Amino acid sequence: CHAFGAHAVFPNTRTVLDFGVQDNKAIHVYKYGLVTSFHMNDRCAAGCGRYLGYIADEFGLSLNELGPEANKAKKETTICSTCTVFAGAEIKELLHNGEQKPDILAGLHKSIVQRAMSLIARSGGVKNEFTFTGGVARNEAVLKYVKQMVIDSYGEVTMNIHTDSIFMGALGGAMFARRNISADLPQGTLVRETGGSVN
């Protein structure tokens, strides 16, 4: 669904990174939006949107404040654990040791993007054009590190990020449903955009 939706909005899409609440997906697509490769994180929600939500709670920030706060960093603090269970304890220890909040957040953002990019590397790397989907694509710091790592590893490629990136999966799902309904209807039946049909 994510690949189909991304391809519908950006027809030249060949690589999709979907950064979701509970999982990350690296997808390669061919023309017509056909999926040729699919990889998803296979352990837990660490490094996904839910992890960022937990981090926001630990710092008393909203999700919308995470990215801008991380972008104030003067350095990126090395984060050893991306496990949600242990992240809170590590953050408290880093703060106790004098690390600054923006620096810790920058390190956290960089760490989760590195995990996502390793997923893309396992799937065969970035092929031009690259489309970034999911709600986390709206996080400024995540976006900064994704762009940086794509350029560092694969050179200059066209990167697509839609303002409604969070809805790409829903769009693809709706398009699949519409196509399947159309295929099941008697020949000559027209499907209205509203979802109704007329003979």
Regions found by a protein language model. Give the residues of each.
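Adenine-nucleotide phosphate-binding core of ATP-dependent small-molecule kinases
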Residues: 87-119, 166
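Conserved phosphate-binding catalytic cores of ATP/NTP-utilizing and phosphoryl-transfer enzymes
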Residues: 1-20, 25-32, 37, 121-122, ...
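Acidic-glycine-rich active-site phosphate/pyrophosphate-binding loop
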Residues: 20-31, 82-89, 139-154
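Glycine-rich phosphate-binding loops at beta-strand->alpha-helix junctions
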Residues: 124-149, 162-166
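Glycine-rich phosphate-binding loop plus the immediately following alpha-helix
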Residues: 9, 31-75, 175, 179
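Internal, active-site/partner-interface "lid" segment
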Residues: 62-93, 186-189, 196-198
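Glycine-rich phosphate-binding/hydrolytic loop that grips phosphoryl groups
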Residues: 4, 52-54, 160-196
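Active-site nucleophile and cofactor-binding loops and adjacent substrate-binding regions
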Residues: 1-2, 17-21, 39-47, 107-109, ...
